[in-house]
């Protein structure tokens, strides 16, 4: 008898409490199983992570994409990169590939009068995950929630004022679970847009305050001073503070990242923002900029300004307790490119880096999804 994949083996013994649960499992489980196998996870870990997905994550995904609306016909639209409420992605390093599950915890109540801005489900899920044998510490969750998520009173004030908030801007919290060597590292993403509307406080002010709130040991003081100083010195109408992320770890070990969108697609602007106007000139910064330029050229990025309905560039600044105090990343939108063009660009980039194994397997793996 031919051996079954972990997904098919588990499917024989899982029961489903409702049709949404079954739809999520049959719709997304095979993809997760294939990606785990292609990334080289040992079979035992494939069973582990598929079980985690079925038993603990699917109940926090809310109505399935095929069934749509929740209670009272409410249909929650997540902010998650235009891909719906759930996203699987791979992180490539020279000698390894790891998987990431990003999603907005959601319930049937999301978008109804009982949970207008889908605030409740994330905290409930984190409580469930804390009871598992994985490395999650939620001590930083509460100060981030209090600083960046609307309170019940602020929520009521927005409703009473008749404030119109687009569906795509209602998301306030996302989770990403990084699947690493049989363990899970959880990252929390918090968006202050709704809080800024409710309080009349600029998103940047809320984000700076949130960093200070979770920085109990002044680990990010120097990094924050450099970053804040740049944006005060070089204000730009094309750059906007977007959100903050922190891993859910002990405060002495947790990282903090700040994200900024950029609608100016000129390479000169990328250089200026990446180096913070020349303030950052250390070797890791310049090497990262060099690699970003290689990918930029391979993709053939247009220098035209982003249109209102297109995705901007996304800059990430990770705050660090030692030099170099900031570590940058650049997210380049690929909307408008075909999957074939994107795959060819990734393969070409891997080849430039000398990552021959990744270059050889990337197209084949992608075509299977």
From Swiss-Prot:
Q: Where is the signal peptide?
A: none
Does Cytoplasm count among this protein's keywords? no
The residues that hold dimethylallyl diphosphate are 100, 189
Spans through the membrane: none
Q: Could you say which protein family the record assigns here?
A: Belongs to the tryptophan dimethylallyltransferase family.
**What is the recorded function of this protein according to its Swiss-Prot or TrEMBL entry?**
Prenyltransferase; part of the gene cluster that mediates the biosynthesis of malbrancheamide, a dichlorinated fungal indole alkaloid that belongs to a family of natural products containing a characteristic bicyclo[2.2.2]diazaoctane core. The first step of malbrancheamide biosynthesis involves coupling of L-proline and L-tryptophan by malG, a bimodular NRPS, to produce L-Pro-L-Trp aldehyde through reductive offloading.
NCBIfam families from the xrefs?
A: arom_pren_DMATS
The protein depicted here goes by the name Prenyltransferase malB
Organism, by scientific name, is: Malbranchea aurantiaca
Taxonomy of the source species: Eukaryota, Fungi, Dikarya, Ascomycota, Pezizomycotina
**Gene coding for it:** malB
